[in-house]
Amino acid sequence: MFELQPSSIVVLVFCVLAIKVCISLIGKTTIQDRIWYLYTIGASKAGHSKFVALAQKREELVRVNKERRAISAQDEYAKWTKLNRQFDKLNSEVNDLAEATSSEKAQISKLVNLAIAATTTAPIWFSRIWYRKVVLFYLPPKVFPYYIEWVLALPFIVTGGVGLTVWMFALNSVLSSLEFLIKFYLEEPVKKPEAPAASEAQTKQ
């Protein structure tokens, strides 16, 4: 039932590990927050009272905030103060409604974690067990010394072949390096430290 060609196993494992790296780059918390946001929208459209009220309050909060930012506190102080009080009140109501739905948010987060595990961790462990003796491909004769071929065949493959264990190790190494480079590129550059002022330098002397 679960028998696959070696080429299909190679592609399957690559896709699963690539998804795992993408999830790591995005972050589980970010994914949970986005799915929760979509869930609240869907629940409000479905008529869930708490989420309907939460969606309405959020829309009103955004509207009041735009109005508040559009006027000057100095020129229209009375109107700005009124909007500011209204904003604070709405913000408090939104927080209260969000807390009222916290139990449902926890359930959604749990389901997201289960979905991530089912998408990444479960297929990897299943493949390690089910396809542990499958030779994914064979090395050309005498490309490596015998002891290297023997190591690459560990722990279940005949010498000269490459199995899932070594293939996954190689893929993880490449994808981890790629993940590091992407994170490094996306991080904000560190500013060059400023040279100490002349007075500070003299003081130290």
Curated annotation (Swiss-Prot):
Q: On the Lumenal side, which residues? A: 1-9, 138-161
| Record Gene3D superfamilies | Helix hairpin bin
Chain ranges passing through the membrane: 10-29, 117-137, 162-178
Report the principal subcellular site.
Answer: endoplasmic reticulum
Q: Name one GO biological process term.
A: vesicle-mediated transport
A GO molecular-function annotation:
protein-membrane adaptor activity
* Topological domain ranges for the Cytoplasmic compartment: 30-116, 179-205
Q: Output a single Gene Ontology CC term carried by this record.
A: endoplasmic reticulum membrane
Membrane topology type, per the record? Multi-pass membrane protein
Cell compartment(s), UniProt: Endoplasmic reticulum membrane; Golgi apparatus membrane
Task: Look up keyword Coiled coil and say if it applies.
Answer: yes
Which portions of this protein are annotated as coiled-coil regions? Answer: 53-103
Q: Which domain of life is it from?
A: Eukaryota
Q: InterPro entries under this entry?
A: Get1, Get1_fungi, Helix_hairpin_bin_sf
Task: Name the family.
Answer: Belongs to the WRB/GET1 family.
The record's function comment reads: Required for the post-translational delivery of tail-anchored (TA) proteins to the endoplasmic reticulum. Together with GET2, acts as a membrane receptor for soluble GET3, which recognizes and selectively binds the transmembrane domain of TA proteins in the cytosol. The GET complex cooperates with the HDEL receptor ERD2 to mediate the ATP-dependent retrieval of resident ER proteins that contain a C-terminal H-D-E-L retention signal from the Golgi to the ER.
Q: What is this protein's record name? A: Golgi to ER traffic protein 1
Q: Which gene is this protein's source?
A: GET1
